[in-house]
Amino acid sequence: MLRPALSFAFAASLALAAHARADDAPASVRYQLGLLSRGPTWTPEKNAHTDSIQAGHMANIVRMAEAGALVAAGPFAGDGQWQGLFVFAPDVDSLESLLAGDPAIASGRLSCTLRTWVAPPGLGEQYRQRKAAVTADGRSPRDSMVTFAWVMLHRGRKYDSRPTPAVEKLVRQHFEYTEKLRADGRLVFAGAIEGTGDLRGVLVMQGDSATVARAANDDPAVRAGRFAPAILRWWTAWGTIPGH
């Protein structure tokens, strides 16, 4: 539950959170978002050693998911600095030990940056229900991968944390715009990043790269320079995003 003493900057940033369904209006929860990037020992080469690390990385993902700690995961397309992400359940403890069990992180091939992501509940729930179902031959359904645009909203060149009337108006316009995106099906999940860092929020969107880029850049808060979007293509298992 959100504390009433939250600062204006954080309370305003919660306008990023778009609900999966307006008639439900679910309360937000505090996920732990782990952004995976190239680590200090990352190399582009693939060999028996890197294959072993990758196999251990995937096995650890399965362990964390089966333990109920991991509710979403998946790689980013391409071969840039950002490699993928983890989303951990709100009530998970000992994240450090979970991440230490990942050979890719322990070896320095990947680095994980943790942020608190305030977003609607239900992430990964449909996937877990589907995996729990058993087919007639006693096997769980195979995973199907789907892709979304992962839009990270960073502080823009004109970001202002002061609660001025102009800022309040811009935050309202931003919220109204994201609600419009949600209503027409382009925005499927979203939430604010807690704290005062550079990353302020994340939008998960449907559509091709050009369509998503236009939608992100048409955000009044982006046009005004409050936010600067960075768009990645994210692969994840079908059912991770509620309704998708």
Where are these predicted regions, by residue range?
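N-terminal secretory signal peptides that target proteins for export/translocation
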Residues: M1-L2
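Bacterial N-terminal signal peptides
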Residues: A5-A17
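Conserved, structured core segments of small domains
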Residues: D23-H244
